[in-house]
């Protein structure tokens, strides 16, 4: 069951009454619009599919139906707070989201003050959970991801890096700086150029000209899906032949459509999941069937049935809340769900799911993929210690 709320609907942000009847509400706090809308909706698809697989849960011997309450945080920090307040007022018992660390950070205090736990799927900036006992996440963090990509770049023979990031974007600046710091510490490696651009900027010629002049082996450009297609094309049109790498947000086929398949050949990224993982075969088969059986879902997934990592994370975030609810004793409150989440441990489709003292997932490995012939090709796993295991 899915219910949609809209930012702007009057809301004080006050918690609704305690759970009544046989329905529990889980909030979906994701961007449906704005620069992160495409990725956000892929994460939503994972949660929607999870709700189809497990539409109810038994708590204290009573079965409850799960209703998803969706809001659009618009990829905007101000709108995110309003969206979070609307979820609180709707009576959700827990929240999933968000794709985009900035909006997650912005809304974090709203959920904390209302004592409603949130489980992020792909919000990787450390600030999301830091100091907030009500925020959890099922993904790895940017310090880990930045180090992983620096290790991969070094393993690929790249010794000079140009780093380009978006001003004011917590994800982009955070991941860029973690990559730069890790890369500069590696033997024979140096960051030869650092550039920044503003939100909604579309002309990157000045930045790319300066980056090209520094003669890098690799450009590391953590950005939104929208920006990625533009900047890759402009870089290749300018004659930049260096490797191009980024983080998890770039696992979206729209990028290749917008930049041109030939321009994206060899672009590398880190991500959380590979659909060819045999341990997740049941999920992959079921999710593909869901996409192919629902025209709207297939369209939101870019009109293909490739399983995005963020969809798998959205699925795992939902299942983490279900596992927590199973272990609630006494009244079903946000505080009780939070306490149960802290000790959750189960096998998710993206790996084993458990949380450390900060609410962060215990993850030690990233999947490396490259864009090749218009598709994402899994090439191996990378750890922060430099260990790279090629795909079989």
Feature roles, as predicted:
Residues 177-275:
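Extracellular/periplasmic bilobed ligand-binding domains
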């Amino acid at each position: 069951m899915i219910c949609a709320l809209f930012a702007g609907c009057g809301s004080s942000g006050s918690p609704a009454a305690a759970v009544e009847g046989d329905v529990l509400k889980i909030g979906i706090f994701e961007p449906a619009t704005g620069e992160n809308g495409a990725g956000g909706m892929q994460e939503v698809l994972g949660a929607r599919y999870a709700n189809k697989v497990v539409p109810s849960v038994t708590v204290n011997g009573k079965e409850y139906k799960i209703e998803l309450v969706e809001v659009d945080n618009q990829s905007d920090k101000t709108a995110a707070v309003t969206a979070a307040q609307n979820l609180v007022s709707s009576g959700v018992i827990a929240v999933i989201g968000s794709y985009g660390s900035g909006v997650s950070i912005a809304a974090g205090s709203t959920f904390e003050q209302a004592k409603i736990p949130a489980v992020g799927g792909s919000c990787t900036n450390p600030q999301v959970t830091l100091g907030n006992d009500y925020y959890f996440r099922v993904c790895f963090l940017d310090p880990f991801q930045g180090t992983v990509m620096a290790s991969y770049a070094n393993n690929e023979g790249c010794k000079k890096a140009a780093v380009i990031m978006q001003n004011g974007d917590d994800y982009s600046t955070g991941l860029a700086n973690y990559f730069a710091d890790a890369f500069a510490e590696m033997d024979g490696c140096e960051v030869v150029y650092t550039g920044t651009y503003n939100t909604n900027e579309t002309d990157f010629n000045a930045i790319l000209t300066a980056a090209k002049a520094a003669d890098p082996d690799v450009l590391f450009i953590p950005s939104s899906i929208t920006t990625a297609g533009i900047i890759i094309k402009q870089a290749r049109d300018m004659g930049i032949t260096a490797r191009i790498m980024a983080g998890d947000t770039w696992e979206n086929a729209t990028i290749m459509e917008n930049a041109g398949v030939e321009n994206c050949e060899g672009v590398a990224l880190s991500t959380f999941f590979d659909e060819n993982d045999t341990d997740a075969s049941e999920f992959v088969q079921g999710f593909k069937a869901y996409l192919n059986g629902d025209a709207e879902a297939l369209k939101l997934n870019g009109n293909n049935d490739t399983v995005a990592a963020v969809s798998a994370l959205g699925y795992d975030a939902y299942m983490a809340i279900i596992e927590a609810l199973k272990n609630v004793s006494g009244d079903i409150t946000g505080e009780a769900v939070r306490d149960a989440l802290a000790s959750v441990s189960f096998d998710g489709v993206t790996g084993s799911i458990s949380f450390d003292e900060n609410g962060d997932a215990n993850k030690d490995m990233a999947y490396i993929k490259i864009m090749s012939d218009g598709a994402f090709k899994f090439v191996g796993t990378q750890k922060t210690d430099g260990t790279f295991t090629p795909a079989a």
